[in-house]
Structure formats: C-alpha cells, structure tokens
C-alpha cells in the first residue's frame, strides 16, 4: 500500500476544516458479494468523464485523486432496463463552491435506491473496492477521475437463459413378433404410464397374432378324439384276439385229458395239472420216468393224482355257484 504523506500545518488544515465542516474520517467499504434481486444481477457503472475545467480547491482534489486506488475497467454489457438519469445534470464551476463542500466527504457513500428503478427490488449493497494494481489482470491502466457531482447508474441485466433439456431420441420400432420395450420415462411421470404401455403392447401383440376360429378348434379336437378312439379299438382287438387264442388252445387240451364229462368246465390251471399227471401215467406204462425229481412213480399213483385234481376243481366250482 502506498505511503500517505502527513499533512503539514498551515493553510491545509484551515481549508479542510472549512470545506468538510469539521474533521471526518473517510471509511472504505468492505468487500461484499454482489446480490441478485428477483433474478437480476445488479452492479454499478461509472459513466463519468473527466472535466478539464475542474480545479481542486487549494489542491484538495489533487490529493484525493492521489489517495484513491485505480480500479480495473470492466466491460459494459448492453443495458436492458432504463437507467435513472443523474440528478442535477453536470456540475458547473459555480455549483462546486462552498455549498457542495459536504458532498465531497460523502461522495463514496452515494448510491441509488432500487426502488426508483423498479418497484419491489431490494436496495443493492455497495460495490466492493477495486482490486490493487498488482492483482489486476488488465495491467496498470488509469481510470478517469470520478467526479463527486456525477452519480453512478445502476443497470439491470436479465439472467442468462438456461438451455432447455433436449428430449431423448425415440427408440427404433422393433418387429411385431418381438416384445416391445417400454419407452424411457421422465422422473416426474408416474409408474402408471409404463404399466399402461405394457398392457397396450400386449394387446397389440395378441391382436397381431390371429386366434383360431371356434369352428377350426372344434374340428381339430374332434379329429384328435377320433384318432385316440381308433387306437383304443385296435388295442382292444389285439387283446381280445390273444385271449381268444389262449382260450381255444386250453379248450383243445381239455378235450385230450381225462375228465368226468366233456361238458365240465375246468380252469386253465386245472387243465394244466391234469395234463401233467396224464402224461406221467402214460410214461409209466412205457417204463419211462418224466417226473421232475425222478421219484419213479407207479401207474396207479399217477391216476390218483389226476383224480384228486378233478375232484378239487369240481368242489371249487360248487363253492363259486
């Protein structure tokens, strides 16, 4: 920070007391971030131009110019809202006399109320002090001296418009045979849209595949039933033929074995036992032994076995009757 020279006693002290109506301290505004009022950025813009006729009273303004830091120029955007014209226009040499001395000390505290620019807007805070020359990106460029008579203009610029979110591209239409996926839903939509979409797709798929007519379904079912019935009839016929063949063979064997009468009904098991004993009896007559254990039975024993088998079969028939 630059060193401020100390004022010497003499005419300077008298002039300062007269011009400022007493000793006052010049306060520097603190740094505060710029605020937004109803979505608009507010900032101060200095449109003052230096006047060559402005002469400091007894060197006071020259010293004020030396003590004021040099701010960096800011690019000026195109104003949107109309700015309030400065009050009182430009100052003349006569108006800068003793009557405007109180305004010299309070020049840095002046700002317009936003109520005059737009109703309902809050009063903007004072702008932060400009950055020092060592941190200024634009280099040490001198700004014209600010006249205390001229007042800054407050411009309102609309906030930058946000880009609208682009809609997602529609998925390509798949063939009707495949299942159609549900379209991507936005966060605000409910789950009922996806459910209705799935139901609608299923309805379209079912309508795309034609159903069988009632007449065709009846004809197909009747054909199936007829085929099954034919197969059952063929199986029954084969079983019947087998049973009839076996029954005929046992009947022929029964006629060859001895029995009480030819009209006597014998079971297949009884017919087989009588036939075995009858064969053993005939073998004993020929002096042959066909027995399983080679017991060498006599002819009378073989006849008794046949008799016992016929009697047991007769008793069984009587019990059944």
UniProtKB/Swiss-Prot annotation:
Cellular compartments per GO CC: chromatin; cytoplasm; nuclear speck; nucleoplasm; nucleus
UniProt cross-references to InterPro entries, sorted A to Z: ATOH8_bHLH, bHLH_dom, bHLH_transcription_factors, HLH_DNA-bd_sf
Region (Helix-loop-helix motif): 244-282
Quaternary structure and interacting proteins, as annotated: Efficient DNA binding requires dimerization with another bHLH protein. Interacts with NEUROG3 and NEUROD1. Interacts with ZFPM2; mediates indirect interaction with GATA4. Forms a heterodimer with TCF3; repress transcription of TCF3 and TCF3/NEUROG3 dimer-induced transactivation of E box-dependent promoters.
Domain remark text: The bHLH domain mediates transcriptional repression by inhibiting TCF3 transcriptional activity through heterodimerization.
Function recorded in the entry: Transcription factor that binds a palindromic (canonical) core consensus DNA sequence 5'-CANNTG- 3' known as an E-box element, possibly as a heterodimer with other bHLH proteins. Regulates endothelial cell proliferation, migration and tube-like structures formation. Modulates endothelial cell differentiation through NOS3. May be implicated in specification and differentiation of neuronal cell lineages in the brain. May participate in kidney development and may be involved in podocyte differentiation.
Name recorded for this polypeptide: Transcription factor ATOH8
Source organism: Homo sapiens
Organism taxonomic ancestry: Eukaryota, Metazoa, Chordata, Craniata, Vertebrata
Gene this protein is translated from: ATOH8
């Amino acid at each position: 920070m630059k060193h401020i020279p100390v004022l010497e006693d003499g005419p300077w002290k008298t002039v300062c007391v007269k011009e400022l109506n007493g000793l006052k301290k010049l306060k520097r505004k603190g740094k505060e971030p710029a605020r937004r009022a109803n979505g608009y950025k507010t900032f101060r813009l200095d449109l003052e131009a230096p006047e060559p006729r402005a002469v400091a009273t007894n060197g006071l303004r020259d010293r004020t110019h030396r003590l004021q830091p040099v701010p960096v120029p800011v690019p000026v955007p195109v104003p949107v809202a109309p700015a309030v014209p400065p009050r009182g226009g430009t100052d003349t040499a006569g108006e800068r006399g003793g009557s405007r001395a109180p305004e010299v000390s309070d020049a840095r505290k002046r700002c317009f109320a936003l109520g005059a620019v737009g109703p309902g807007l809050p009063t903007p805070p004072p702008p932060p002090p400009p950055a020092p020359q060592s941190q200024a990106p634009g280099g040490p460029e001198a700004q014209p001296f600010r006249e205390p008579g001229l007042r800054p203009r407050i411009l309102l610029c609309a906030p930058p418009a946000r880009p609208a979110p682009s809609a997602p591209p529609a998925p390509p239409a798949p063939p009707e045979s495949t299942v159609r996926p549900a379209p991507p839903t936005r966060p605000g939509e409910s789950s009922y849209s996806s459910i209705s979409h799935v139901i609608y797709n299923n309805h379209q798929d079912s309508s795309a595949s034609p159903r069988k007519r009632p007449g065709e379904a009846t004809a197909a079912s009747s054909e199936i039933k007829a085929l099954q019935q034919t197969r059952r009839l063929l199986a029954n016929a084969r079983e019947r033929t087998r049973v009839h063949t076996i029954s005929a063979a046992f009947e022929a064997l029964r006629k060859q074995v001895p029995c009480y009468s030819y009209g006597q009904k014998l079971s297949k098991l009884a017919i087989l036992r009588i036939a075995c004993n009858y064969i053993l009896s005939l073998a004993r007559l020929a002096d042959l032994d066909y027995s399983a254990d080679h017991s060498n039975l006599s002819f009378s024993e073989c006849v008794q076995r046949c008799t016992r088998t016929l009697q047991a079969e007769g008793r069984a028939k009587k019990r059944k009757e």
